């Protein structure tokens, strides 16, 4: 009995090996592999979101490359700001980025303030949804673009809708367009290691009695094809006296195929500046017990940083070395990769000028 089972297993192994060889011959080497061979799952390449808290919540230190990402939320919640920060981070890694501005609403001056290099950014303002997705497909297939942002899915208007009358009913047209495009895109996105971020808006479903009435535009295809889905919300305002200077923002990782989902991150988005790095250092420092909070005062190593978050934020902005030191201590305690030495970041001319002065 044992001998016959062994013979059967040997025959099955030979048949499998022949099938694998045939598949590789027909479709190319690497088309099919065993998961345990090691060459299949490499370390996931990621790009920082520009927010330390969100990078930690994502579980892999940022957004994964070669994947589809969806970022959605209400109006003025920080969707475009977050994607512009991701573009800035990708450009720091010498990556090529493209922005498909279907809404025709990109503020180039604001993008520049967030650290985006406009000279290197590719931008397209397509007329129709089909044109926008054809451009995305061409850029992905080129293999030379590292990040593409589509702003937004709701603005990808099908050609038939644009050419029709104002009152025409064309149900499911945009959903079919997105479904077809994502079927074509997914495989090439993985091969080219290009990250595609779709910004999406929220709509309300009518007549929903139980559960959330909120839904995103463009049908269900994007929900399935996206490896990461981020729900971004404004939860409060940041004031300096009576003046509102920014928004308190909460991001929930609704879906995550590369790490456990449902984690959240909270950070400040300051108008004209983007995600407040110093604000995050203070908040995460208190959580990690690197910074002590007593009443309204914040202290580090027994020395007071400032009274109130706004003053503490300004102090850290004026003392980048200290901010760098605190951030690395936070990263160490939370098990995230440390930042490089600050000497690398500060230009040499600055030190010489300071010494000469």
Curated annotation (Swiss-Prot):
GO cellular component: cytosol
Matches recorded under Gene3D superfamilies: P-loop containing nucleotide triphosphate hydrolases (3.40.50.300)
Molecular-function annotations in GO: ATP binding; ATP hydrolysis activity; ATP-dependent DNA damage sensor activity; damaged DNA binding; single-stranded DNA binding
Keyword Glycoprotein: no
Annotated SMART domains: AAA
Keywords recorded for this protein, A-Z: ATP-binding, Cytoplasm, DNA damage, DNA recombination, DNA repair, DNA-binding, Nucleotide-binding, SOS response
HAMAP family, alphabetized: RecA
Function in brief: Can catalyze the hydrolysis of ATP in the presence of single-stranded DNA, the ATP-dependent uptake of single-stranded DNA by duplex DNA, and the ATP-dependent hybridization of homologous single-stranded DNAs. It interacts with LexA causing its activation and leading to its autocatalytic cleavage.
Protein's name according to its UniProt entry: Protein RecA
Source organism of the structure: Methylibium petroleiphilum (strain ATCC BAA-1232 / LMG 22953 / PM1)
């Amino acid at each position: 009995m044992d001998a016959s089972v062994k013979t059967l297993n040997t025959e099955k192994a030979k048949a499998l090996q022949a099938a694998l060889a045939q598949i590789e011959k027909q479709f190319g080497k690497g088309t099919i592999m065993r998961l345990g061979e090691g060459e299949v799952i490499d370390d996931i390449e990621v790009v920082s979101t520009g927010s330390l808290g969100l990078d930690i919540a994502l579980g892999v230190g940022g957004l994964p490359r070669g994947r589809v990402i969806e970022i959605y939320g209400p109006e003025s919640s920080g969707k475009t700001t977050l994607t512009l920060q991701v573009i800035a981070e990708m450009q720091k890694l010498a990556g090529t980025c493209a922005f498909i501005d279907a809404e025709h609403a990109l503020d180039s001056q604001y993008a520049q303030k967030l650290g985006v290099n406009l000279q290197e950014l590719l931008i397209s303002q397509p007329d129709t949804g089909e044109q926008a997705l054809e451009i995305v497909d061409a850029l992905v297939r080129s293999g030379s673009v590292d990040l593409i942002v589509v702003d937004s899915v709701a603005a990808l208007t099908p050609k038939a809708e644009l050419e029709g009358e104002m009152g025409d009913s064309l149900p499911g047209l945009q959903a079919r367009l997105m479904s077809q495009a994502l079927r074509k895109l997914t495989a090439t996105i993985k091969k080219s290691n290009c990250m595609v971020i779709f910004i999406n808006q929220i709509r309300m479903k009518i007549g929903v009695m139980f559960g959330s009435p909120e839904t995103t535009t463009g049908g269900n295809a994007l929900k399935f094809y996206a490896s990461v889905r981020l729900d971004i919300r404004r939860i409060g305002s940041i004031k300096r006296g009576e003046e509102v200077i920014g928004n308190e923002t909460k991001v929930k990782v609704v879906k995550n195929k590369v790490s456990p989902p449902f984690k959240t991150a909270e950070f400040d988005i300051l108008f004209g500046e983007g995600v407040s790095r110093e604000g995050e250092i203070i908040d995460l420092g208190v959580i990690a017990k690197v910074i002590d909070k007593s009443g309204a005062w914040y202290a580090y190593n027994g020395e007071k940083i400032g009274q109130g978050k706004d003053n503490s934020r300004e102090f850290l902005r004026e003392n980048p070395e200290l901010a760098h030191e605190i951030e690395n201590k936070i990263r160490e305690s939370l098990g995230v990769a440390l930042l490089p030495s600050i000497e690398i970041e500060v230009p040499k001319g600055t030190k010489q000028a300071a010494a000469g002065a």
